[in-house]
From Swiss-Prot:
Stated family: Belongs to the RNase Z family.
Co-factor requirement: Zn(2+)
Organism: Protochlamydia amoebophila (strain UWE25)
GO molecular function: 3'-tRNA processing endoribonuclease activity; zinc ion binding
Reactions listed under catalytic activity: Endonucleolytic cleavage of RNA, removing extra 3' nucleotides from tRNA precursor, generating 3' termini of tRNAs. A 3'-hydroxy group is left at the tRNA terminus and a 5'-phosphoryl group is left at the trailer molecule
Protein's name according to its UniProt entry: Ribonuclease Z
Tagged with keyword Glycosyltransferase: no
Amino acid sequence: MSVRDLTILGCSSQQPTRFRNHGAYLLRWNGEGFLFDPGEGTQRQFIFANIAPSVINRIFISHFHGDHCLGLGSILMRLNLDKVRHPIHCYYPASGKKYFDRLRYGTIYHEMIHVVEHPVSKAGLVEDDGRFKIEAAFLQHGIENIGWRITEADTRKFDNQKLIDRGIRGSLVKELQEKGQLNLDGQTIYLDDVSWIRKGDQFSVVIDTLPCQNAIDIARNATLLLCESTYLEEHKELARLHSHLTAKQAALIAKEANAKQLILTHFSARYQNLKLFEQEARTIFANTFVANDLITFPFTKVNLKS
């Protein structure tokens, strides 16, 4: 079984602290590595997490404030140093193309990796490669800023007991799967009679925004929602002034979106006790947890029928 988890490489907003690095988040899912918003120092955090950066094949930048992208150049150079052979797909707001280029080409090195750019200029479907569907929504942060939703493809699952009851095994299973029906002992058995469609899980990221409908929409029905909560509710005016969320507001988004699990991140350096964020959010959305550097959260499969 492939690894399915979310590792918090950093969870601080704007500036790192003694205990929290700039934000960066690695999602390992079905043999792929999705890196979100690599801030300064991300490469070193991989060492502490005991994860090889070569697992990365997709990088997402929500916007081009420094704490969300300053680690991009060093990560690309590290992948180049490691001579990774797979393409590195990079998704970012199209309006930030010049900043992407500055980060990518900010120093002298011979780039040998294959970087595939996906500048996003409109909301909606960005890519569907048959394994994952990637969607974007524009959030409210004063500059162009994107929330992401990644959904795995639906898969068909056989009901083993139904196969046994009908005497279907071995090559007959393959025939049924390929043809959609099977004639056995004078009876026609259809694929739907002995199987069901498992709905693909969904991961959503809402980083740096005021409360808005787009944040709810991109988080809709997320199996796992990673959401910023820069401030506690007692500082909600600061959150409004800087276009951020409080823990309470993040929880309201998760609740309204019908998310299954919420991970809070992107904490202001003014706070030491992150449990306060968890406590505040859980009054509204019980299945809430706080990020902390180098913590790994399991991304558990949810077997829902489509």
